[in-house]
Every structure is written in structure tokens, then in C-alpha cells.
Amino acid sequence: MRIDGVRLWALLYELDDPAHLEMPQGFDWEAARRQFDGLVARFNSAFQTTCATDRSIEDASYHAEVTVPSDATATGADLVVRVSNFGNLAVLALENPGAYDQEEFDALVHVSDLTRIFECLDEGDYILVPEEPLWAPYDGRVPASVFLQSKPSWWIRYFDYL
């Protein structure tokens, strides 16, 4: 499932709980890991490769990251999917998060790669959110002093180290 616009912002604000910074109340780490491992297996199959993963995440609002290597994509560049600890959110980036704006991303990523990624995410019940809006200044309920960086963003709130 993909979400953007008004629905995206409503969901981000709904998930924002100042009492639970790294993960929502009741977060089931083992279930999240099984869900992520299933995603990686689907990517490996869909792209006929072995994707790189980063599963050793601590002190962060995201759970893990998987990279589809450039030589397995029609795009010819790495495709990175990072999954949040919140609301089954996932984000797709070209090469590295923050490297391209939405217009560049849309122009560079091959539709066949998008189709495979969307299908794999949908099968895992992830909600794909666009990356670019997440770089907007954070104006949620968590005090700004909690964030390590001087300019907190929605990206940090749900997809980065705190």
C-alpha cells in the first residue's frame, strides 16, 4: 500500500507518541523481524539476487534496511528500503536516503523495479511512504530537545537514529 498527501500526514501525526520514541507501545520486535526477513526473502526472489541488509539497529526509530544491489535492478543503481518501527511504514530510496528529490527519483527509477518492490512490500503489509515529505521540519508532539540533530525532521522521527 502506498500513501501520500493528507493521508500521509494524518498517519504520521497519529503514530507520533512522545512517550514512545524508538518504538510504539506494545511493539513486537520478534514479529517485526519476521516481517522484515520475509520482505528480504521476497526481494531476493523478485530480483534473483542476495540483498544486503542492516539488521543491527539500536537507539533508532527504524527497524532495519535492505538494499537491492545495482546489478540486479533495471535502474542500474542500488535501491534501499528502510522500515520503521512505527505502523509498518517503509520508505524507498535510490542509492541512499536523501540522495535524490522526488522528481529525480521518478525520472531515474525503472518502472519494473518499482513494480517488484511495490508487490514485495504489499505482500508484507508494509505502507510505503514517499521519502521527500519526511525531510520536512518535525512539528509533532515530541520535544525538539529529544532529537540529536539541531533540526529535527519527520525522517528522523520515523526512519533514523534518535
Predicted regions located by residue number:
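Amphipathic, interaction-prone secondary-structure segments
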Residues: 36-90
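Generic detector of well-ordered alpha-helical segments enriched in charged/polar residues
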Residues: 9-13, 37-40, 114-122
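Short, extreme N-terminal segment that most often corresponds to the first beta-strand
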Residues: 1-34, 154-162
